[in-house]
Amino acid sequence: MPFELKRPDRNHLLHHFKTIPGNPPVEWKISNNLIEYPEALHYMQEHVENIFAQNAPEQVWLLEHPSLYTAGTSAKKKDLLAPHLFPVYEAGRGGEFTYHGPGQRIAYIMLDLKRRRQDIRAFIGALEEWIIQTLAKFNIKGERREDRVGVWVKRPNYPFTQSGFSPEDKIAAIGIRVRKWVSFHGVSINVNPNLAHYSGIVPCGITEHGVTSFLDLGFSVTMHDIDIALKQAFEQIFGPTIDVS
């Protein structure tokens, strides 16, 4: 029988993406006002080019958007169920349709993977691990799924799906793009958004499972609480940060 080399799943990939010694810490930027999506996209594209040219440091940008939908490169038109409910933007990231809005913490991640690890699959695993460790600080058990990117929470008190799957909901989505080995776009974590706003799309093209949030799970936390936990978990995986305005 010929030897078959199996591709390792994301659970078994190393999750440490700390930069090579001597590089500056990652800028940690928080915006407290709602940021329009085109403004954020323009900022990311410009910052990514500056990182590649070694004219800007790596950065994580935490923010919230007004209510909107974004379409990734794999989005299907049929999954946009209510095209006039909120503005719809072509994101250019991987993935399908998702919702962004108040009460959701967005983390845009602009890292130079050449300084870290040039492995996109492992990078996505590291982002999932970052979220899982963040959730654990609030005693929420987040899990990854090999066939679905993102972080999921089991719902044992819910009925099984129509296909007989165990019930679980997505609490965090991941959609990234890598240009010249510099990442942008990032992750979104549902803290206390209006989950009804997801009804205008098929989130990430997945019909068998729903979405949840900290509040939906019974956890009343502030965005500041989330930001502290995100920073602590980020530094464990990606290395030191420095606050910027």
From Swiss-Prot:
Localization per Swiss-Prot or TrEMBL: Cytoplasm
EC number: 2.3.1.181
Protein's pathway: Protein modification; protein lipoylation via endogenous pathway; protein N(6)-(lipoyl)lysine from octanoyl-[acyl-carrier-protein]: step 1/2
Domain of life: Bacteria
GO molecular function, one term: lipoyl(octanoyl) transferase activity
Keyword Transferase attached: yes
This protein's GO CC annotations: cytoplasm
Any single biological process term in GO: protein modification process
UniProt keywords, alphabetically: Acyltransferase, Cytoplasm, Transferase
Top class in the EC scheme: transferase
Pfam family, one: LplA-B_cat
Site (Lowers pKa of active site Cys): K170
Binding site for substrate: R93, G94, G95, E96, F97, T98, Y99, H100, A173, I174, G175, G186, V187, S188
Domain BPL/LPL catalytic: 54-242
Active-site residues (renumbered): C204 (acyl-thioester intermediate)
Catalytic activity: octanoyl-[ACP] + L-lysyl-[protein] = N(6)-octanoyl-L-lysyl-[protein] + holo-[ACP] + H(+)
HAMAP family: LipB
Note, other: In the reaction, the free carboxyl group of octanoic acid is attached via an amide linkage to the epsilon-amino group of a specific lysine residue of lipoyl domains of lipoate-dependent enzymes.
Record PANTHER family: LIPOYLTRANSFERASE 2, MITOCHONDRIAL-RELATED, OCTANOYLTRANSFERASE
Family: Belongs to the LipB family.
Function description: Catalyzes the transfer of endogenously produced octanoic acid from octanoyl-acyl-carrier-protein onto the lipoyl domains of lipoate-dependent enzymes. Lipoyl-ACP can also act as a substrate although octanoyl-ACP is likely to be the physiological substrate.
Name this polypeptide is given: Octanoyltransferase
Species of provenance: Bartonella quintana (strain Toulouse) (Rochalimaea quintana)
